[in-house]
Amino acid sequence: MKYDVLVIAGTTESRQVIEKLLRANPKERILASVATELGKEMLLEYGIDIHVGRLDYDGFLTLFEENPCRKIIDASHPFA
């Protein structure tokens, strides 16, 4: 599937970003990437697709190749 936005999530701010995106365009196709199942649980209410798992450089490349997106928003922890 082609997504409008990939949100690299991991902070409270990532939830705020997703909320704003959906408020602006409820039909926005969003994929969120989180490191843990807990992160996934925190985003389930938004009805978006969620990738779970820690990603290194190659993991991100694979994610991008398998899930094309028009925009990427990095809302991960600033020290991660």
Regions found by a protein language model. Give the residues of each.
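Short, charged/polar "capping" segments at the starts of alpha-helices
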Residues: S14, L38-L43
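Extreme N-terminal starter segment of soluble prokaryotic enzymes
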Residues: M1-V5
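Short internal beta-strands
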Residues: R29-E37
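Short glycine/serine/threonine-rich phosphate/pyrophosphate-binding segments
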Residues: T12-V17, A80
